A protein has these predicted regions:
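A structural signal for small-residue-enriched, beta-sheet-centric alpha/beta enzyme cores
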Residues: 1-74, 78-89, 98-401
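Generic structural marker for isolated residues within well-ordered, non-membrane alpha-helices
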Residues: 94
Length: 401
């Protein structure tokens, strides 16, 4: 497997574009389209927030189909908490794009992101969809990635290629997300394309499994959004022997590539946490179960006290072991060990009395890894997060305006 440059148009048979439709007050790109030139197996996972937005309800119906061909996206307005009109507007968005693309509406996923509680500006949106479809080609992946952003500070993309059944198979993805990140899948927008030939039912299961290993292991602020989604299209144009089950000899290679792409995007989202100055990797080892390991890691990663300590470059390890302790994960307290940046701070549940000056260079780094051993078993899990800064409060205090 090899990492390559490129966005969602890197695999064969995909066109994309992003345009400025005037939905965002900033005037930035705000409408995007991703299109497969042939029907593609599809798989998706969506937010578990019970106040899910209208486009999520519509796209869940699309995901019941084996194949799809398009993803239509707007940013700047979430179309959430908009009642019956929101559903009607979402379907108009879907119908309009499908008609222009010459496909059935149920072959078009739709996604929206932005401020909750406002109706979509339909005239601008429908014009934007038409403009994006007119502009789409194999070189416009960058503008497409720009158009799905809200408070993001940089484009998030990843791509890989590998040989499957003697054929060169590519996978590529883009993502949006900086705040409201505590996926259960999902709390972000993620779109992945591949030219691998894989059966729709196998792809749907693979997408859920990949989300659990990547996006569901990221937390920025502990909030779960109303909108966001992970959607994968696989159009088969690589012409490998179709992967019909998880037992197929080529399935592991495909799944490894899918997880790698998703994990890269997930880490980029943690790097771009609103106002973030640190990227934090939380490793839990020695857990009684994988779920316990994830539970403890999430508790540490979500803790405002932990996140603010890292912003202040304060090696307050007590906050880390405290969060693990209240997480509910099984542990043997008198055997717990903790390291930050490879330096042992806690051994057998007690302070190692490491001098502050030894830790200062580690705490000043942008990327910091910590590992806590619960001494309760052999399982492990890793969660990615970021710190909480003054800027995070400022961004979210001013977001609506």
């Amino acid at each position: 497997m090899k990492k390559i440059d490129g966005g969602v148009t890197a695999p064969q048979g995909y066109l994309a574009a992003g345009v400025k439709a005037g939905i965002k007050a900033s005037g930035n790109h705000d409408v995007a389209v991703i299109y497969s030139t042939v029907p593609a197996a599809c798989g998706a996972v969506f937010t578990q927030n019970k106040m899910c937005a209208a486009p999520v309800l519509v796209s869940r119906e699309v995901n019941k189909q084996p194949y799809a061909q398009a993803i239509l996206v707007n940013s700047g307005c979430a179309n959430a908490c908009t009642g019956a009109q929101g559903i009607e507007d979402a379907k108009k968005m879907q119908d309009h794009g499908a008609e222009l693309l010459g496909i059935e509406p149920e072959q078009a996923f739709i996604c929206s992101t932005g401020v909750i509680g406002h109706f979509l500006p339909m005239d601008k949106l429908l014009t934007g969809i038409a403009d994006a479809i007119d502009a789409m080609d194999e070189t416009e992946g960058e503008s497409c990635a720009m158009a799905i952003q809200t408070t993001d500070t940089f484009i998030k993309k990843a791509a890989y290629e590998t040989e499957i059944d003697g054929k060169l198979v590519k996978i590529a993805g883009i993502a949006k997300g900086a705040g409201m990140i505590h996926p259960n899948m999902a709390t972000m927008l993620t779109f992945i394309t591949t030219d691998c030939a894989i059966a729709p039912d196998v792809l749907k299961r693979a997408v859920k499994a990949a989300a659990d290993k990547s996006f569901n292991m990221v937390v920025v602020d502990g909030d779960t959004s109303t909108n966001d989604s992970m959607i994968v299209l696989a159009n088969g144009l690589a012409e490998n022997e179709i992967i019909l089950s998880e037992e197929h000899p080529d399935y592991p290679a495909f799944f490894e590539m899918l997880v790698a792409c998703a994990t890269d995007l997930a880490k980029l989202i943690a790097h771009d946490g609103e106002g973030a100055t640190k990227f934090l990797e939380v490793n839990v080892v020695g857990a009684a179960s994988w779920q316990d390991a994830k539970t403890a890691a999430m508790a540490i990663a979500k803790s405002p006290l932990v996140k603010t300590a890292f912003f202040g470059e304060d090696p307050n390890w007590g906050r880390i072991v405290c969060a693990a302790g209240y997480s509910g994960a099984e542990m043997i307290a008198e055997k717990v060990n903790l390291e930050i940046g490879g330096v042992r701070l806690v051994e057998n549940g007690m302070n190692c009395n490491v001098p502050a000056e030894r830790l200062a260079p580690i705490m000043a780094e942008h990327d910091i890894s910590m590992t806590i051993d619960l001494a309760a078993g052999e399982e492990k899990a890793t969660v990615w997060t970021c710190d909480f800064s003054y800027e995070y409060v400022k961004i979210n205090g001013e977001y609506h305006t």
